[in-house]
């Protein structure tokens, strides 16, 4: 059994639903910095209280406080994706209206907005179960062009740059310095030196009941508007505009293969023959190198 604990400040509705929990420092039980944050916010009709949470990371989350701590553990880089149990986490998180004045309940939000408008313009960032990561955790050594594009529970390694059109879901992210201009779906990891090009997509495990975990190895390149539905080893390239799924027929070494049979292979370029239209895989002799100036964060 692996345990983790932290003290944080929780936001509760008048009916006791937990809207959020912020754990500023993993492992700390010091309440002194959080005490001034406790109290009632009548405009939002919520109460903020200090909580201390201890969990078994090998077991499934048991309540909302537990679920929030697991998301913090990922974004604080205490646990890598897939090394902490997140079974059933969706059912433990409440749908929340995320505003510039803090989280609000969905029920009755029209009146909540009216009360908050006395403080100034009310901006709604999203209505979702997951907030923006940077509102709770700002990892060292990363750049994020658009805070709305990275969910709490994302794991961003030192040296990662997420450009404005990049996206990183929870329980997913980068294991080393990487350029993210495309979408890293839930459950996906990309390793050191990999470049996810603009508009590129990596197939996740949430949609359609998918169970296969997709990962990209070191020094890979997904070209602009390409897609990847199989794990890649190191030094692989998918050319711009080409989407590789598990069932894609690929000409490799003189015969046709399902792309799934090449999963995890190192040193391949996947491209479409511009004359025949056939997807082919050939040995990669190129070396993908990131611009170090863009990753000295």
From Swiss-Prot:
Gene3D superfamilies: 3.30.70.2010, Hexapeptide repeat proteins, Trimeric LpxA-like enzymes
Transmembrane intervals: none
Protein name: 2,3,4,5-tetrahydropyridine-2,6-dicarboxylate N-succinyltransferase
Listed EC numbers: 2.3.1.117
Source organism of this protein record: Corynebacterium glutamicum (strain ATCC 13032 / DSM 20300 / JCM 1318 / BCRC 11384 / CCUG 27702 / LMG 3730 / NBRC 12168 / NCIMB 10025 / NRRL B-2784 / 534)
Domain of life: Bacteria
Alphabetical UniProt keywords: Acyltransferase, Amino-acid biosynthesis, Cytoplasm, Diaminopimelate biosynthesis, Lysine biosynthesis, Magnesium, Metal-binding, Transferase
Family of the protein in this entry: Belongs to the type 2 tetrahydrodipicolinate N-succinyltransferase family.
Active site, per annotation: 181 (acyl-anhydride intermediate)
Disulfide linkage: none
Gene: dapD
GO MF annotations in UniProt: 2,3,4,5-tetrahydropyridine-2,6-dicarboxylate N-succinyltransferase activity; magnesium ion binding
Record: residues binding succinyl-CoA: 183, 198, 201, 224, 239-240, 247, 258, 271-274
CDD domains (alphabetical): LbH_THP_succinylT_putative (cd04649)
Location in or out of the cell: Cytoplasm
């Amino acid at each position: 059994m692996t345990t983790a604990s932290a003290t944080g400040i929780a936001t509760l509705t008048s009916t006791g639903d937990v809207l959020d929990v912020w754990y500023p420092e993993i492992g700390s039980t010091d309440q002194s910095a959080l005490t001034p944050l406790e109290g009632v916010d009548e405009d939002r009709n919520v109460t903020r209280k200090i909580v201390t949470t201890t969990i078994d990371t090998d077991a499934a989350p048991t309540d909302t406080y537990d679920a929030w701590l697991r998301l913090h553990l990922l974004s604080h880089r205490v646990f890598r994706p897939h090394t902490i149990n997140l079974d059933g986490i969706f059912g433990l998180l409440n749908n929340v209206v995320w505003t510039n004045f803090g989280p609000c309940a969905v029920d009755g939000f029209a009146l909540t907005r009216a009360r908050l408008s006395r403080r100034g313009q009310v901006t709604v960032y999203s209505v979702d179960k997951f907030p923006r990561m940077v509102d709770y955790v700002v990892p060292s050594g990363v750049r994020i062009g658009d805070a709305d594009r990275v969910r709490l529970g994302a794991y961003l390694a030192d040296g990662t740059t997420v450009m404005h059109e990049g996206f990183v879901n929870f329980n997913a992210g980068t294991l080393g310095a990487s350029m993210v201009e495309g979408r890293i779906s839930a459950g996906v990891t990309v390793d050191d030196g990999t470049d996810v090009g603009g508009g590129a997509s990596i197939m996740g495990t949430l949609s359609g009941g998918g169970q296969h975990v997709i990962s990209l190895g070191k020094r890979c390149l997904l070209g602009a508007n390409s897609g990847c539905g199989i794990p890649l080893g190191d030094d692989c390239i998918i050319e711009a505009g080409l989407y590789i799924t598990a069932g894609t027929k690929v000409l490799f070494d003189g015969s046709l293969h399902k792309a799934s049979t090449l999963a995890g292979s190192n040193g391949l370029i996947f491209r479409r023959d511009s004359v025949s239209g056939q997807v082919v895989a050939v040995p990669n002799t190129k070396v993908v190198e990131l611009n170090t100036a863009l990753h000295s964060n």
